[in-house]
């Protein structure tokens, strides 16, 4: 059970990083729309977070697959496949010259991903709490055997 608790702690921090990353991207796009940032700064800030987000999402999905958590894997695999498709088609970076033309689509995409990552974060927090309670109650039961 200790490995299960470790899995959920790692998943907690990875999903928290994903939520923070996408939230930062939404803030950058909102600042661009309000004319607080120029297109170059916005695209630079967002583009440097895209590949780490893809890697974190893919590794989290792979972690769920390798630990046989099928429900979490099936929840996470559509976004992972979408990220792989974007990477394969080379459409994952925001172009400086066309950022204003596609800002509404990019914001909708980021809001959708933010909603998905918040949902995944809530699921992981629930399982982390459940695993911690089970882990600590089993340890207490083992102490009474001696």
Curated annotation (Swiss-Prot):
Q: Which residues cross the membrane?
A: 9-29, 61-81, 114-134
Q: Does the keyword Amino-acid biosynthesis apply?
A: no
Which Pfam families would you find in this protein's record? Cornichon
Q: Which SMART domains match?
A: Cornichon
Question: Keyword Transmembrane helix, does the record have it?
Answer: yes
Listed GO biological process terms: vesicle-mediated transport
Cellular compartments annotated: Membrane
The GO cellular component terms are: membrane
Annotated membrane topology is:
Multi-pass membrane protein
Q: What is this protein called?
A: Protein cornichon homolog 1
Source organism (scientific name)? Arabidopsis thaliana (Mouse-ear cress)
């Amino acid at each position: 059970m200790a490995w299960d608790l470790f899995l959920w702690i790692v998943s907690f921090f990875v999903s928290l990083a994903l939520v923070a990353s996408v939230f930062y991207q939404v803030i950058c796009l909102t600042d661009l729309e309000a004319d607080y940032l120029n297109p170059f700064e916005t695209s630079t800030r967002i583009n440097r977070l895209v590949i780490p987000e893809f890697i974190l999402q893919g590794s989290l999905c792979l972690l769920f697959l390798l630990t046989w958590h099928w429900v979490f894997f099936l929840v996470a695999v559509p976004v992972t496949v979408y990220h792989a498709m974007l990477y394969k088609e080379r459409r994952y970076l925001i172009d400086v010259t066309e950022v204003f033309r596609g800002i509404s689509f990019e914001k909708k995409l980021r809001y959708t991903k933010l909603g998905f990552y918040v949902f995944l974060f809530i699921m992981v927090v629930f399982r982390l709490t459940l695993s911690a309670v089970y882990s600590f109650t089993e340890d207490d039961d083992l102490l009474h055997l001696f």
